[in-house]
From Swiss-Prot:
The modification Phosphoserine is found at S234, S297. GO terms for cellular component: centrosome; cytosol; mitochondrion. Residues 127-152, 163-182, 216-252, 313-333 are annotated as: Disordered. Residues 322-331 have a biased composition (Basic and acidic residues). This is Protein FAM110B. It is found in: Cytoplasm; Cytoplasm, Cytoskeleton, Microtubule organizing center, Centrosome. The gene is Fam110b. Its main location: cytoplasm. Belongs to the FAM110 family.
Length: 366
C-alpha cells in the first residue's frame, strides 16, 4: 500500500450532523430567511393565475401603450338560468309571475331581455286563464239537452227485445195475467236501464222476479184443466219462467234471405276464379262448360247450407218453450250432406282429371 493513501486517510476528520445539514442545503435558500419555509408549510398557498402572470409581464411583449394600460378581466363561466316553473305548480302556489334566477353581474341589455320575456309570459298566462274562465262560464250558463241520441236508442232496442208477443191459438186468462206481469217487468226494466246501461245492470234486470199479476176481472171464467206436464210444475217455477224466456231471447233477428244475401256478396273476379279454377276463357271453351256445373253446384250448396245452419241456430235460441216454433225451424233446416274435406277432395280429383285430359289431347295431336 502506498504511503500517500495512508496519510490522506489519517487526515480525514469525522463530520458532525450540523455540518452535513449545512453542506446539503444550498446557501441561496438559507439566505431567504424563515418566511420562505413558512409559505411552503401553508396548506393552500395562493397562486397567481395565468392571466395575472401575463398581466405582470405585459410590458415585455406588448409595444403599444394603450394595450399596456388596458386591464384584461378573467372570463368567468356563465351561470345558466333555472327552468321556468310549471303552470300547474304556479297556480297551486298562487304566484302570478315566473321567477328566473340569473347571475348578479348581468349587463343592462340582459336585464331588459329578461323583463321582456317575463312580460310576454305574463300576457300569455293571463290570456289563457281568461279564455279558460270564459269558456267555463259559457259551459256553465249553457243548458244542454239530455243525451238521447245513443242511450235512448239502446234502451228502446233492449226494451223491444224484452217484449213477449202472445202466440196465436191461446187466449186463456192465465196468459193474459202473465202478459200483464211481463209488461210490468218491462216497465221496471226501462226505469232501471234509464239510470245505467252496463252489462251488470242488464244481468240484474233479467234476474229480477216479476211482480204479481193483477187479475183482470173478478167474473173471469174458470181455468181449463192443465196438462200433466204443467201440473207437475211448482208455482216458483211459474214465476221464474218469464225471466228465463226474456234472457234467452236474442236482441237481433235476421231472416234467411238476409243471411244468404250477405254470404253471396262477393267480387265477381274472385267468384269466377274459384268456380272456373283460374282457367282462361279459351281453355274453358275447349274443355266444355258442362264440366264445371258439378263444382259450382257443390260450392253454392255449401254456402247456402252454412247460411241456413246459422239462421236455424238463431231460431232455436229464440224460444225454448214454444214447441211449434222448434218444429218449424227443424223442418226448415237443410241437411248438411257434403263436408268441406270431401268437397276439396272432389275438386282436387276433378282438376287432376282435367290435367290428364289435356295431356292426352297433346299426345294425340302429336
Amino acid at each position: 500500500m502506498p504511503t500517500e493513501t495512508l496519510q490522506t486517510g489519517s487526515m480525514v476528520k469525522p463530520v458532525s450532523p450540523a455540518g452535513t445539514f449545512t453542506s446539503a442545503v444550498p446557501l441561496r435558500i438559507l439566505n431567504k430567511g424563515p418566511d420562505y419555509f413558512r409559505r411552503q408549510a401553508e396548506p393552500n398557498p395562493k397562486r397567481l393565475s395565468a392571466v395575472e402572470r401575463l398581466e405582470a409581464d405585459k410590458a415585455k411583449y406588448v409595444k403599444s401603450q394603450e394595450v399596456i394600460n388596458a386591464k384584461q378581466e378573467p372570463v368567468k363561466p356563465a351561470v345558466l338560468a333555472k327552468p321556468p316553473v310549471c303552470p300547474g305548480t304556479k297556480r297551486a302556489l298562487g304566484s302570478p309571475t315566473l321567477k328566473v334566477f340569473g347571475n348578479h353581474a348581468k349587463t343592462e341589455s340582459g336585464v331588459q331581455r329578461e323583463t321582456l320575456k317575463l312580460e310576454i309570459l305574463k300576457n300569455i298566462i293571463n290570456s289563457s286563464e281568461g279564455s279558460s274562465s270564459g269558456s267555463g262560464h259559457k259551459h256553465s250558463s249553457r243548458n244542454w239537452p239530455p243525451h238521447r241520441d245513443t242511450t235512448d236508442l239502446h234502451r228502446h232496442s233492449f226494451a223491444e227485445s224484452l217484449k213477449v208477443y202472445p202466440t196465436p191459438g191461446h187466449g186463456s186468462p192465465q196468459e193474459s195475467s202473465s202478459h200483464v206481469s211481463r209488461r210490468l217487468l218491462e216497465q221496471s226494466a226501462e226505469t232501471f236501464l234509464h239510470v245505467s246501461h252496463s252489462s251488470s245492470d242488464i244481468r240484474k234486470v233479467t234476474s229480477v222476479k216479476p211482480l204479481k199479476a193483477i187479475p183482470c176481472s173478478s167474473s173471469a171464467p174458470p181455468l181449463p184443466p192443465k196438462p200433466k206436464v204443467a201440473a207437475m210444475k211448482s208455482p216458483e217455477a211459474d214465476q221464474v219462467e218469464p225471466a228465463c224466456g226474456v234472457s234467452r231471447r236474442p236482441s237481433l233477428q235476421r231472416s234467411k234471405s238476409d243471411l244468404s244475401d250477405r254470404y253471396f256478396r262477393v267480387d265477381a273476379d274472385v267468384e269466377r276464379f274459384f268456380n272456373y279454377c283460374g282457367l282462361d276463357p279459351e281453355e274453358l271453351e275447349n274443355l266444355g262448360m258442362e264440366n264445371f256445373a258439378r263444382a259450382n253446384s257443390d260450392i253454392i250448396s255449401l254456402n247456402f247450407r252454412s247460411a241456413s245452419m246459422i239462421s236455424s241456430d238463431c231460431e232455436q235460441s229464440q224460444d225454448s218453450n214454444s214447441d211449434l216454433r222448434n218444429d218449424d225451424s227443424a223442418n226448415d233446416r237443410v241437411p248438411y250432406g257434403i263436408s268441406a274435406i270431401e268437397r276439396n277432395a272432389r275438386i282436387i280429383k276433378w282438376l287432376y282429371s282435367i290435367k290428364q285430359a289435356r295431356e292426352s289431347q297433346k299426345v294425340s295431336h302429336v
